[in-house]
Amino acid sequence: MQQSAQLITENKEFNEDFPRFLKDVGLDNVGFDYHVVAVLGSQSTGKSTLLNKLFGTQFSTMDTVRRQQTTKGIWVSRGKDSSILIMDVEGTDGRERGDDQDFERKSALFSIATSEVIIVNMWENQIGLYQGSNMTLLKTVFEVNLQLFHENIERSRLQFVIRDFLGSTSLDNLSETLMTDLNRTWASISKPEGLENSVITDFFDVDFSALPHKVLCAEAFDEETDKLREQFLDEKNPKYLFKPCYHKRIPADGFPLYTQGIWQLIQNNRDLDLPTQQQLLAQYRCDEFIAEAMVSFDEQCEELLTFLKTHQSIENLLQRLEAIQTSTFSIFDENARRYQSEVYTKKRQELDRMMKTRLAVPIQRYLAAIHKELVAGFPERIATLVKDACFKDVARVTVSEMVSVMHSEAAALQKEGFVCDAEQTVETLRVELLQLVRSMREERLAQISAKLMVQFEQEFADAIDVSFHHLTKDIWDNIMHKFDELREKVLDEMLRSLNEYIDDEMDEDAELLRTKHMFKLKRSTWLVLRRTLENETAEPILQQRLRTHFEDSFRYDSRGIPKMWKKSDILENDFNKSLQDTLQLIDVLAIVRLKDGSVPTVDVPLAEEGEDTASNLEADTFFTFLNRKKKANIHVSVKRAADLVFLDCKRSIISTATRVPGYFWALLAVLGWNEFVSVLKNPVLLTLLLIVVSFLFILVQTGLAGPVKAFAERSVRNAVNSMGEKLAEKLDDYRSTSPASETTSGRVISAENSSVDEKVSTTP
């Protein structure tokens, strides 16, 4: 079966075998159940490739090596698994035809007159170009189409397919540009009577699609092509292209005769003839003069780039640009004004557009250099001015000044037509400066926050240290009171800084920024609380603090004076009381709980987004520092340390009671009476006695008698122990040097050793 056929030859002849082709592909007897699609566009833009991809046809495609014309005339084929007749039209602007645009216009007019949907295939970089986007061709086609068929014209769809779409410019913006060009083209054509006020949408529905690069973005190209295919094939698709109003209402078996009649009408119409020889000559010569003028223009552009590196003022730049344009126009006008005025005027406008387009590059570099210079100097200027003023005020004024500088430059260039959108240039600078302001602000606020947290952590750690050195049952009330006090101080300071750095006029989300920074600081204070208390309640540290607390409460009275016990029952009572108080503190320190039994309330979420909700930052475990195992370990450790202290004190009482029996004092009074009387009679000894008595009296009155007594007892005990050890050494030496004596006097030595050992053992 024949896959495709040539409907119109390259010599503008209609194929008489077209009816046989329709029969071969099975479209001759489908009645109205068929559709016609044609594709227009420049040569070598991939029209045939697109049709093959969309409809499964097998049109010949371009030789990518030699880049020769493949489609000559108009070829037709039936879409795979569909009743769609596809027309592949020879590309426009091909080198094979050169300036012969007659076939281009006639084939385009034929396509519009016979097809329901006309695919206009173009590259993205052709948009905005008058010739490249086929606006000249469409203008002629629209005009003649109205003249020939306005009495019985049918609606059609123009489906623009933008190829090699990059996405840097949105499809909406490209569509808007094309639609503007179409409306301008339609407005410029001469219309038949009664259609003077018509618009293009009265006769055409216009839509736009975009396809990525077929080679560089193959997967994306296939995906978007599949979507576009569904618009042709799926009647349930919201973007289905073949609306009933587009159909020409010609049965399939009569379509060959209908198309042949359309082609003959177009062939015989003089309105589609080639331009006159005078116009051709004018166009040809004016193009030569444009090329000549552009040589001089390009040389001056190179000089302009060097000129711009010196950062000249905008006035000097405008003068230079005007001189370049004047010089270029003078070269063109010198010869071109002698030719047809209409062609001369159009070509002069074309030259002006070309110059504006090429000058856009150095001008953009000039504006980019100003932009870069302003942005580079912005942080330094802010840092200089902020020393004497508020950050937000300095930032607002500096942004306004720099934006004003850019606006004056861009507006002056826009006024002369060198810049299309000065506001966009200014807005780009404004956005970047505001981003710099935000970046500098965040950096400074982070420094302030870090500094405040260091200060807070240090002061809170000092307060915690003091509280844990003097453990009480209301320790948590004291700590939380100090925490709230220091925290309020830090938050107030941070809020003041936020008000200095965040500008309600420049920042739409000013309140949100304040809330975010305050939230982070509040959370940090709670984490410092947790971290500091974890350090203080670590098992070894807490054990030592509780031992110290026990000894302080057990060994010293309320005035801080060391206690001396004479009776065991008093010692035991003091021990039990101090031990119970100390052990009760373990439960107190295990969890932060205030006097009223409540746990402090955390005013911010402690777990960051994404953290496990069962982490130790949750409220139910945040204030718990000792579990059962830790409490048991600390309890045992403190109890053992307390027992050792108790035994030491108990031993001291027993030792004192054992060393000084009651009869000793009576014996001392009887035997020492004479000595006592002699002391009273001797002035020197009496004076010495009075001094000693006075010293003892002072010790008793100041409460130092107990410590002095304990010191003396320890000294005597140590001296006795030392003497016993020395005596034992002497006895050992004596045994080693006198064995006979040891034998004969064994019992005596044994008795002596026994008495010494007994004497040493009674000294605790």
Swiss-Prot record:
Residues 731-764 are annotated as: Disordered. Its main location: endoplasmic reticulum. The chain crosses the membrane at residues 660-680, 684-704. Its EC number is 3.6.5.-. Residues 31-246 form the GB1/RHD3-type G domain. GO terms for cellular component: endoplasmic reticulum; endoplasmic reticulum membrane. Residues 1-659, 705-764 are cytoplasmic. Keywords: Coiled coil, Endoplasmic reticulum, GTP-binding, Hydrolase, Membrane, Nucleotide-binding, Transmembrane, Transmembrane helix. It is a multi-pass membrane protein. PANTHER family: PROTEIN SEY1 (PTHR45923:SF2). This is Protein sey1. It comes from Schizosaccharomyces japonicus (strain yFS275 / FY16936).
